[in-house]
């Protein structure tokens, strides 16, 4: 049984600020069939990429990446917000969609040189968190094997920003 994943995305107008249509995947995560379908679709995309690890930025990248890593029987690497990891980490900064700067970090020993990593997140907006995650993976000697999202907000041109950093296989299950 397949479902239309669009039916499981709630749109919240004027959140987090006026003029923004926030796409909330909470209903998708709350429905076992839709959630499994989304994870399985990304796993199907990833199986041809010879992926060693899944990486996801905090926090919804964890929600997509953890079940994906489990389904593929590979490890998951969290890209945490700055200052959240207890051991030596490598970091990168990025500009927030609504202004300001943030930082992501990954433990220094989480990715070995040459490992192929798929970066996943719930939603692609400007591409800042993905490019920061990519920068860290590459600093650690990893190879970004591709990127995958449940939703892409096309008007924010995140895909173009990701590809400007280097072409990689790309998947978005839904575009808005």
From Swiss-Prot:
Please state the pathway this protein functions in, per its UniProt record. Purine metabolism; AMP biosynthesis via salvage pathway; AMP from adenine: step 1/1
Which top-level enzyme class is recorded in the Swiss-Prot or TrEMBL entry? transferase
Q: Main site of residence?
A: cytoplasm
The UniProt family comment states:
Belongs to the purine/pyrimidine phosphoribosyltransferase family.
Q: What is its EC number?
A: 2.4.2.7
Q: Which InterPro entries match?
A: Ade_phspho_trans (IPR005764), PRibTrfase_dom (IPR000836), PRTase-like (IPR029057), UPRTase/APRTase (IPR050054)
Q: How does it assemble?
A: Homodimer.
Give the GO terms filed under biological process for this record.
adenine salvage; AMP salvage; purine ribonucleoside salvage
Species = Leuconostoc mesenteroides subsp. mesenteroides (strain ATCC 8293 / DSM 20343 / BCRC 11652 / CCM 1803 / JCM 6124 / NCDO 523 / NBRC 100496 / NCIMB 8023 / NCTC 12954 / NRRL B-1118 / 37Y)
- Which CDD domains does the record cross-reference, listed alphabetically? PRTases_typeI (cd06223)
Keywords in UniProt for this one? Cytoplasm, Glycosyltransferase, Purine salvage, Transferase
The free-text function statement in the UniProt record for this protein reads: Catalyzes a salvage reaction resulting in the formation of AMP, that is energically less costly than de novo synthesis.
Catalytic activity reads: AMP + diphosphate = 5-phospho-alpha-D-ribose 1-diphosphate + adenine
Q: Which GO terms describe its cellular component?
A: cytoplasm
Q: Which gene encodes it?
A: apt
Where in or outside the cell it occurs: the entry states: Cytoplasm
Quote the SUPFAM superfamilies the UniProt record gives. PRTase-like (SSF53271)
Q: What is this protein called?
A: Adenine phosphoribosyltransferase
- Any idea which GO molecular function terms this record carries? adenine binding; adenine phosphoribosyltransferase activity; AMP binding
